[in-house]
Amino acid sequence: MEDLETIIGLEIHCQLNTKSKMFCSCSTDFRDNEPNTHTCPVCLGLPGSMPMVNKRAIEFALKVGKALNCTIRDESEFSRKNYFYPDLNKAYQITQYDKPLAEWGKLLIDGDNGEKEVRITRIHLEEDPGRSVHMGTTDRGKYTLVDYNRAGIPLIEIVTEPDLRSPKEARKFLNKLRATLEYLNVFDSEKEGSLRVDANISLKGSERVEVKNISSYKGVEKALTFEVTRQRNLLRRGQIVTRETRHFVEARGVTTSSRSKEEENDYRYFPEPDLLPLRVASWVDAIELPELPDARRERFISQYGVSPEHAKTLTGGLKLAEFYETVASEDPALAATWTADYLLGELNYRDFSIDAMPSDLFRELLTLIKSDTITDKSAVEILRLILDAVKDGKKPERPQEIVSRLGLAKTSGDQVTAMIQEVIAEQQAAIDDYYAGKMQALNFLVGQVMKKCRGRADPGHLNTLLKEILDKKV
């Protein structure tokens, strides 16, 4: 069963960063507001109300279509998708069906076996339903309340072909797509629930299972990994994989059966009678795209001389790329190393975004590193103190202030030499071992000097200096 190919396709629902809803003038700034206070007769579907299309949402969707190399249809139309669910107050959703806004695009990712083209089947506009609030655990709630503030928020749904071959590839695709949408300025990934994924997964030759409403990038990889294992185990026991819809319980890292999988005819699609077809041919040429992640990555390599791996990391999000360009002026290579290899690790550990690090303080820290005022170890300590202050809601000290307060400046050459002589006098057994050819003794002696200077010397330089002094004594 291990050799059965994994086949994955994704349906990604992205909330567009507009100020008003898809078909009415209600504000989209509904988070942290009282339930059911951002509604009107249109988004509640009350009798006699008439929808009107949000022009900005169409422009945003066209941008996404062009960025993903799609064919833009000259004419598309809205349809009603009919089904009953508590958070769907009209008992139908206005979406697009057989005439989507854009289709047949592609997105290049770093796949499991090198660069890979993932085909985009279609991109269409639709409205978000309301939000069900389960009182209790998600899969065993005592009862459910419904908040319609989210009903009518503009969405684009991006549907891929089943081109992904592992949960890891699926996450890579989502990361690349998220970055692209951020660069287009049509999507805010930091807003709760702004991206939700339905994942279709099967093992070659078996039925397809849909895992619905996964709300995080990590969650997609976890849900798909669980499903691969579950389906392989079923087949190994001689059982069949049932075609069904499943729900991902993120807290437990498992999927649970929800219902049998619907067919398209279950939704009884028909054209939305209250909206005219969209004719966008005259708009498409006027849509200008900004610099996208791949182009910025190539520019970072050519303009700043950073490595391809660092360039890929630094262009993985719009805010991160802008942060790097803000701090890179003095020494681009040093800034790339410390942003990609040190800062991001500390931010991820604290579940912080790049906004948590004041760029002026990071520039000052880079200056101290470049001028050889502090060691890398001290620089990491300063970085952590700054981020811990931010976490505690305090104003962080400037790096130079921290250096002065904690005495983190590098120990001078004369001081290091004096400390080496002290260690040589104190550690005769280790000296004898060194002269006997036991090179690990040198590492021990370096460690003793580092203790004396409290880590405020460069270990590489110290190793060389100590070896020179010992070799002269032979």
UniProtKB/Swiss-Prot annotation:
Task: Give EC number(s), comma-separated.
Answer: 6.3.5.-
What GO biological process terms does the UniProt entry carry, in alphabetical order? glutaminyl-tRNAGln biosynthesis via transamidation; translation
**Which chemical reaction does it catalyze?**
L-glutamyl-tRNA(Gln) + L-glutamine + ATP + H2O = L-glutaminyl-tRNA(Gln) + L-glutamate + ADP + phosphate + H(+); L-aspartyl-tRNA(Asn) + L-glutamine + ATP + H2O = L-asparaginyl-tRNA(Asn) + L-glutamate + ADP + phosphate + 2 H(+)
Keyword annotations for this protein, in alphabetical order, are:
ATP-binding, Ligase, Nucleotide-binding, Protein biosynthesis
Q: Which SUPFAM superfamilies match?
A: GatB/YqeY motif (SSF89095), Glutamine synthetase/guanido kinase (SSF55931)
Its top-level enzyme class, in one word, is ligase
- Disulfide bonds listed in the record: none
Q: Name one GO molecular function term.
A: ATP binding
- The membrane-spanning stretches of this chain are none
Pfam families in alphabetical order: GatB_N (PF02934), GatB_Yqey (PF02637)
Subunit-structure text: Heterotrimer of A, B and C subunits.
Q: Which PANTHER family match?
A: GLUTAMYL-TRNA GLN AMIDOTRANSFERASE SUBUNIT B MITOCHONDRIAL AND PROKARYOTIC PET112-RELATED (PTHR11659), GLUTAMYL-TRNA(GLN) AMIDOTRANSFERASE SUBUNIT B, MITOCHONDRIAL (PTHR11659:SF0)
The function of this protein is: Allows the formation of correctly charged Asn-tRNA(Asn) or Gln-tRNA(Gln) through the transamidation of misacylated Asp-tRNA(Asn) or Glu-tRNA(Gln) in organisms which lack either or both of asparaginyl-tRNA or glutaminyl-tRNA synthetases. The reaction takes place in the presence of glutamine and ATP through an activated phospho-Asp-tRNA(Asn) or phospho-Glu-tRNA(Gln).
Q: Give the similarity note.
A: Belongs to the GatB/GatE family. GatB subfamily.
Q: What is this protein called?
A: Aspartyl/glutamyl-tRNA(Asn/Gln) amidotransferase subunit B
The species this protein belongs to is: Methanospirillum hungatei JF-1 (strain ATCC 27890 / DSM 864 / NBRC 100397 / JF-1)
Q: What is the lineage of its organism?
A: Archaea, Methanobacteriati, Methanobacteriota, Stenosarchaea group, Methanomicrobia
Task: Name the gene.
Answer: gatB
